[in-house]
From Swiss-Prot:
Membrane spanning residue stretches: 36-56, 92-112, 132-152, 174-194, 207-229, 244-264
Name assigned to this protein: UPF0761 membrane protein PSPA7_4558
Organism name: Pseudomonas paraeruginosa (strain DSM 24068 / PA7)
InterPro entries referenced in this protein's UniProt entry, alphabetically: UPF0761_bac (IPR023679), Virul_fac_BrkB (IPR017039)
The keyword Cell membrane appears for this protein: yes
Membrane protein topology class: Multi-pass membrane protein
Cellular compartments annotated: Cell inner membrane
Amino acid sequence: MREHFNDGIEFARFLAHRFVTDKAPNSAAALTYTTLFAVVPMMTVMFSMLSLIPAFHGMGESIQTFIFRNFVPSAGEAVETYLKSFTTQARHLTWVGVVFLAVTAFTMLVTIEKAFNEIWRVRQPRRGVGRFLLYWAILSLGPLLLGAGFAVTTYITSLSLLHGPDALPGAETLLGLMPLAFSVAAFTLLYSAVPNARVPVRHALMGGMFTAVLFEAAKTLFGLYVSLFPGYQLIYGAFATVPIFLLWIYLSWMIVLFGAVLVCNLSSSRLWRRRSLPKPIVLLGVLRVFHQRQQLGQSMRLVHLHRAGWLLPEDEWEELLDFLEKEQFVCRVGGGEWVLCRDLGSYSLHRLLNRCPWPMPSRERMPAQLDEAWYPAFQQAMERLQAEQERLFGESLAHWLAEGNASAKVT
């Protein structure tokens, strides 16, 4: 039990490290800025899509009210009034204005995809028709799914009102769970569809459930803060709602992006437990696998490296690829696969270690054994090198900095 608890703590630390490394707070700030401009266009698109179906006619405002009541703290009531006014005015725009609103909505989706691809270490985002179809599906199917879910909620409510609480046992509990269910569905769809990478549905669902629960908890705590510490009203006065709403949007995106980090790393949850080897040693191991596959005329992906015994997490693999690609060792051949494109016979180990951005491993950090044919010779050479360094530089600083030794020769 204690071991599982310690593993959970270590995994949480790993996720926090990845959250910062992936620049998620910066992405959340960018998404907050984009959301300010895109929230009205997104609502306008939602109303337009719902108005195309007679059964959903007039349901847009009810959905908007439902969203603000269940997904925004109580401080958002004034913002809701303003947004309803802006959205009503936006419906009377000319076709030029409509195009501008559509572009703004697409810009928000581009920013979301960019943030997710940063977390999933995706080097090449979607392009062309594939990107357009994904965004159009989100903008069109999203409101329709919301409308369908809201219609089911309305039906359950009316059934209870007309035939009494016994008409549908558990209806009240079901209605109370509707906001959480909508959140889980929305986050699951977001995590599975937006990244330009393969995301297992099971992991997306787990991340959606985690994010939805965290979102509900944050909403409750944020509402308590607003009600118990109203000092911001003394500072901002009539404009107090604006900074509070901005802060809530930022916190919401932080939660969404942390959920994305969780989903991304669920597939590598076993790899973070391993004791990391010094990067130069890992680099040599990766080059050895690249060289072997080159001899067979085969390309390489991370899964091939795992099969060869090097269980690297994806972020470390991407970090090594960045260096190897910069030094023109490897080239991408499509489909996320890589090939060795340099003759290793013309490149010395000394040159590689000098170009390597990671420090040379100390004797204490060198693994005692490694299942690699090249490692014993490398280990022996490193021990001799460090012993020679200790012999040459073992004297005290006072000895080296003394004037009498300024012109002394090292022998």
